[in-house]
From Swiss-Prot:
Pro residues: bias regions: 637-650, 704-717, 726-741, 772-782
Bilayer disposition of the protein: Peripheral membrane protein
Organism: Mus musculus (Mouse)
The name this protein goes by in its record: Rho GTPase-activating protein 17
Entry remark concerning the domains of this protein: The BAR domain mediates the interaction with the coiled coil domain of AMOT, leading to its recruitment to tight junctions.
BAR domain location: 14-246
Bias type Low complexity, positions: 653-690
GO annotations of cellular component type: bicellular tight junction; cytoplasm; cytosol; plasma membrane
Subunit: Component of a complex whose core is composed of ARHGAP17, AMOT, PALS1, PATJ and PARD3/PAR3. Interacts with NHERF1, FNBP1, TRIP10, CAPZA (CAPZA1, CAPZA2 or CAPZA3), CAPZB, CD2AP and SH3KBP1/CIN85.
Motif (SH3-binding): 730-743
Site (Arginine finger): R288
GO molecular function: GTPase activator activity; SH3 domain binding
GO biological processes: actin filament organization; calcium-ion regulated exocytosis; signal transduction
Length: 846
């Protein structure tokens, strides 16, 4: 206690008083002492932050730490998900990635254990053991110095007072002297120990710095091992990715898409073309009318994932066309390439048509192989689409306007409107002639179903699956819109599986008197009696496929289960719409109340003999004809007006369109137009001279006034005889331009409408001609032939009233125009009855 009291007294004297303070440490040791606090603080914070960097639990073994790592939990989750997704691409990816994450977690746990053992524990020892020991010795030295100073102060005081008092002082002074020497020795010992520890600490500073080198080396080693795990997993995952072909096609370069999918034609192009070939070829405004945004987005997504379930898009061809345009526009490089942009625009400025076609051909050959094949495929389809321009209104010019900017655009930067404005004019001038002359630019036929992955619809004629008027079972596009007669024509031609055409649905539409007057011709001139020579064709005709089918099945009329007579028709009279005023010479009427009927089937060339089949049915057995019940309400037809402009359906005017799988532009007659007009005028004059006075219609209904405007004419096409010679084979680099080939091939057998015996019917204005279905009329009992070829009787009909059977008119006409009758006799089809329902136009009663 006395020693402690002396220390406090000495400390107070040094602090408050003027007592001398002894400093035993050198300047170097004092500097080392100041650095100890900084080093200790650094080691403490480093240890603390390293613990925060650990993902595992601190202070545990490697296995337990591995289970607690977040990466381990992630790896387990991925592996469980991969087991649920099985063999899908995502399942394989998750499995590989889960294994990699698990391996990374194992490497991380080993790395943390090493860092904790080799780095964190030594840093903790420096901060919490070595430096505190040195600081403890420094405090001990400070206490010893205070004791030494206190003893020395007391010794000095005793030595000063010894001059006045000599009794007892020598012993006290000696005691203080010994105590002072002892305290000095302790100070020296502690000072030496402290200095040694401080110097040792400074000597180990390089060793302490090595801990951080080890930390970085451990991290580098960990990352190397982790990188090895990743490098092992990445190629495997890339292999799975490359093997999986279902990748987005929109916005992907054409070459990459074709290489990845192993296709020749891009999937969106082929899929859209096949869908449009099924239901969109006769859709008006195709590629021009926009589709619904949601429908278009859905179709693009379906094409991106390469789905084969595209049946629902058959009903919306505009969405399909929009998807095709969108794919072409979203290509990083246009189908006609940026590199050839300057050449395309220069060719568009060429005025000479021949040179322009040559330059276009040369530029097409410069396209890359993938672009050339897809461009050829697309142009062939667009040319096929343009063949039905009379229905869909998409001419080559219209197609080039709406689709051209999606095939070629400039590479320079700018707004979409600026690029389109600068490019559209040139593109239209390039695309339009290529579509017009597609067969010359790309000779040969194109198989649109290249991948054979698209199957046509099971019932393509959805509008006509039932002829009873029930459309509830119809599918695809035609169910959503009215059954236009133009579409019916193309679809009915495709129904080759039916041997006959059912006409039950027409029986319900011919009930009213007004309908019969509007459907039937306004008058029927008396037919002259004809002999056998008039009925015989001028020359044998080669049998068609339909006539062979008729002759093989009996060659005569076929009775359906309803008792209605159905006639097999040849291709010549099944497809084209018949003129409204034509009269069949094969079924003239000789009497009104005949009990027998005779049909003359189509003549087939079989060994030069013509076969004729007669079917006789008693009137009582067949039942009364429904047409005889309406005989009393039929009014006499008015006399025909003077012939004016002949309607397009007239035999002397524009001929009917030909038969084909798709509607084609109508072709003119091979004979010159002037000769046809002269023949028409002569026939009309002869008709006015020899036709007796006709009875007029006395119906109570007001007469229908004829329009004052002339009837519209269909677009003209170059005649077959006016086509120039085909270009001969030329070198590929200098092609000879075609002589403007027509859009559709001419069919000589369909270039002229059949001219019938009798007089020319009354001309009347008709609306714009439309393609009508080539379906047979309701059954009419034909007249009976006598032995010499004349007609003896005929069952009267509700649409025509025959009042005369004089044959002098026909004979006089035959004598004046022998070449016309001989030509017509070779073209008329026996056994076929033409009705106004074929054209479905209004009658005009004056």
């Amino acid at each position: 206690m006395k020693k402690q009291f002396n220390r406090m007294k000495q400390l107070a004297n040094q602090t408050v008083g003027r007592a001398e303070k002894t400093e035993v440490l050198s300047e170097d040791l004092l500097q080392i002492e100041r650095r100890l606090d900084t080093v200790r603080s650094m080691c403490h914070h480093s240890h603390k932050r390293l613990i925060a960097c650990f993902q595992g639990q601190h202070g545990t073994d490697a296995e337990r730490r591995h289970k607690k790592l977040p990466l381990t939990a992630l790896a387990q989750n991925m592996q469980e998900a991969s087991a649920q997704l099985e063999e899908s691409l995502l399942g394989k990816m998750l499995e590989t990635c889960g294994d990699a994450e698990n391996q990374l977690a194992l490497e991380l746990s080993q790395h943390e254990v090493f860092v904790e053992k080799e780095i964190m524990d030594p840093l903790y020892g420096i901060a919490e053991v070595e430096i505190p020991n040195i600081q403890k010795q420094r405090k001990q030295l400070a206490r010893l110095v205070l004791d030494w100073d206190s003893v020395r102060a007391r010794w000095n005081q005793a030595h000063k007072s010894s001059g006045t008092n000599f009794q007892g002082l020598p012993s006290k002074i000696d005691t203080l002297k010994e105590e002072m020497d002892e305290a000095g020795n302790k100070v020296e010992q502690c000072k030496d120990q402290l200095a040694a520890d401080m110097y040792n600490f400074m000597a180990k500073e390089g060793e302490y710095g090595k801990f951080f080198v080890t930390l970085l080396e451990a991290q580098a080693d960990y990352h190397r091992k982790a990188l090895a795990v990743l490098e092992k997993a990445l190629p495997e995952m890339r292999a799975h990715q490359d093997k999986w072909a279902e990748k987005p096609a929109f916005g992907t370069p054409l070459e990459e898409h074709l290489k990845r999918s192993g296709r020749e034609i891009a999937l969106p192009i082929e899929a859209c073309v096949m869908l449009l070939l099924e239901t969109g070829m006769k859709e008006e405004g195709l590629f021009r009318i926009g589709a619904g945004a949601s429908k278009l987005k859905k179709l693009k997504a379906a094409l991106d994932c390469s789905t084969s379930h595209l049946d629902e898009f058959y009903s919306d061809p505009h969405a399909v066309a929009g998807a095709l345009k969108s794919y072409l526009r979203e290509l990083p490089e246009p189908l006609m390439t940026f590199s050839l942009y300057e050449e395309w625009t220069q060719v568009a400025s060429v005025q000479d048509q021949d040179k322009k076609l040559q330059y276009l051909w040369t530029t097409c050959q410069k396209l890359p192989p993938q672009n050339f094949v897809n461009f050829r495929y697309l142009i062939k389809f667009l040319a096929k689409l343009a063949q039905t321009s009379d229905v869909n209104k998409m001419t080559p010019s219209n197609i080039a306007i709406v689709l051209g900017p999606n095939l070629l655009w400039a590479k320079q930067e700018g707004t979409l409107a600026e690029i389109a404005a600068a490019t559209s004019v040139h593109v239209v001038a390039v695309i339009e002639p290529i579509i017009q002359h597609a067969d010359w630019f790309f000779p040969g036929e194109v198989e649109f179903n290249v991948s054979e992955a698209f199957v046509p619809l099971a019932t393509p004629n959805s509008n006509h699956s039932s002829h009873t008027g029930n459309d509830s079972d119809s599918g695809t596009l035609e169910r959503k819109r009215p059954a236009s007669m133009a579409v019916m024509e193309g679809d009915l031609v495709k129904k080759e599986s039916f041997g006959v055409k059912l006409m039950d649905f027409q029986a319900h539409r011919r009930g009213g008197t007004l309908n019969r007057k509007h459907i039937a011709p306004a008058f029927q001139p008396p037919l002259p009696p004809t002999d056998g020579n008039a009925l015989a064709p001028a020359g044998p005709e080669p049998p068609s496929q339909s006539s062979r089918a008729d002759s093989s099945s009996g060659g005569g009329p076929v009775f359906s289960s309803t008792g209605i007579l159905e006639q097999g028709l040849s291709p010549g009279d099944s497809s084209p719409p018949k003129p409204k005023d034509s009269v069949s010479a094969a079924v003239p009427a000789a009497g009104r109340n005949s009990n027998q009927m005779t049909t003359v089937p189509n003549q087939a060339q079989t060994g030069g003999n013509s076969h004729q089949l007669s079917v006789s049915t008693p009137h009582s057995a067949a039942g009364p004809s429904p047409h005889t019940l309406r005989r009393a309400v039929k009014k006499p037809a008015p006399a025909p007006p003077k012939p004016g402009n002949l309607p397009p359906g007239h035999p002397g005017g524009q001929s009917s369109p030909g038969t084909g799988t798709s509607p084609k532009p109508s072709a003119r007659s091979p004979s010159p137009p002037q000769q046809q007009q002269q023949q028409q005028q002569q026939q009309q004059q002869q008709q006015q001279q020899q036709t007796p006075g006709m009875r007029r219609c006395s119906s109570s209904l007001p007469p229908i006034q004829a329009p004052s405007h002339p009837p519209p004419q269909p677009p003209t096409q170059p005649r077959l005889g006016e086509q120039g010679p085909e270009p001969g084979p030329t070198p590929p680099q200098t092609p000879t331009p075609p002589s403007t080939p027509p859009l559709a091939k001419q069919n000589p057998s369909q270039s002229e409408t059949t001219q019938l015996h009798g007089t020319l019917p009354r001309p009347r204005p008709v609306p714009k001609p439309r393609n009508r279905p080539s379906v047979p009329p309701p059954p009419h009992p034909p007249g009976t032939h006598t032995v010499d070829g004349g007609l003896t009787s005929s069952v009267p009909t509700a649409s025509r009233i025959v009042t005369d059977t004089n044959s002098r008119v026909s004979e006089s006409l035959r004598s004046i125009f022998p070449e016309i009758h001989s030509d017509l006799a070779s073209k008329e089809v026996p056994g076929h009855i033409l009705l106004d329902i074929d054209n479905d136009t209004e009658s005009t009663a004056l």
